[in-house]
Amino acid sequence: MEHHANIVPWQMLCERSGATLKVAPIDARGELDLEAFRALLSPRTRLAAFTQVSNALGTVLPVREMVAAAKGVGALTLIDGAQAVPHQRVDVQALRCDFYAFSGNKLYGPTGIGVLYGREALLREMPPWQGGGDMILTVSFAGSTWNELPWKFEAGTPNIAGAVGLGAAVDWLEALGIDAVHAHEQALLARATAQLRSIPGLRLIGDAAHKGAVISFVMDGVHPHDLGTILDAEGVAVRTGHHC
């Protein structure tokens, strides 16, 4: 369900801090067990981090309900929106999440740049994660003070070219119309799913009721890399093997 970017950092943090990482189960259809998720939450829960749309299964998670459940025990929430933002309308205010992150390359923009939304009150409380130029207000050998938001978190020379490219990608997507993009992709998803189901020996992975335009599948007796090579020779682009 989750991208490695929403697994590995928390494992590393738990190793450093002694925190415990808990994982909510999914069912055979690739859908989150929402009641099991709620059962994992307690007043000791500090952060609930989850994807909005799975990059591997296409499952669209019930993020509003998940945010509400986490807030009910006083936990902060972070949503990985990398697979959602380019394909559907997203309103972080309506979701009521504390943090929301997505990448530039999934938005058809440059690599090496992304976006992190955070509630202003939380960002003001947080210390800088990196030191350097621009993130300071004053500097002396006796001590330094930090700049205002968002510059407090932008140490050093930023990825200027990447930011310009990301802005152009956003403009292009907005010109297409995100609702039109979503409708077109859902039509393609329905057609592709129906066609794939008709192929003998092909098994779809994940059959959630609400899906983004992602389909994972395997073929009986055929290694995914071999299948990918054959499809590539026919001009069909697929992703095979280990996802990130």
Label for each model-derived stretch:
Residues 1-244:
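Pyridoxal 5′-phosphate
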